[in-house]
Amino acid sequence: MNYANFGLELFKSIADAAYEGKRVELAGKTLALKNRALDTERDYNYARLAFEKQRFETNADLRVNGDLYRMQALRAAGYRLNPFSNGHQIYADEAAAANLHSYYGFYKTD
């Protein structure tokens, strides 16, 4: 054993142990960051899958019930709509009032 190099070897072994500890610590932090990135990516993919599923179900629902929803929305907005009419959408009391006014207008004698 060479006592001249004993101090250097001791110092080198301490430095190597510190370096190895720091390397292990950094490797642990790197692994934690990679796990966090993978968790974030997984959460994003699940959210995207849920959105795509909702979009597909909404599109399928609109393909089946879209006209019904449109009619309900227009009626809720105050439009008087009859899906079976020919475009002359007038109610019976309005027709009676129109006939009455046309009668008075046509047979006006004053």
Swiss-Prot record:
Key words, A-Z: Capsid decoration protein, Capsid protein, Host cytoplasm, Virion
Keyword Nucleotide-binding (UniProt): no
Entry's localization field: Virion; Host cytoplasm
Presence of keyword NADP: no
Main location class: virion
Superkingdom of the source species: Viruses
Cellular component, GO annotation: host cell cytoplasm; viral capsid, decoration
UniProt record similarity statement: Belongs to the vesivirus VP2 protein family.
Subunit structure: Homooligomer. The portal-like structure consists in 12 copies of VP2. Interacts with capsid protein VP1.
Additional detail: Translated by a ribosomal termination-reinitiation process from the bicistronic mRNA coding for VP1 and VP2.
Function: Minor structural protein that forms a portal-like structure at a unique three-fold axis of symmetry, following binding to the host receptor. The channel formed by VP2 may allow the delivery of the viral genome through the host endosomal membrane.
Domain commentary: The N-terminus domain points away from the virion surface.
Name the record gives this protein: Minor capsid protein VP2
Phylogenetic classification of the source organism: Viruses, Riboviria, Orthornavirae, Pisuviricota, Pisoniviricetes
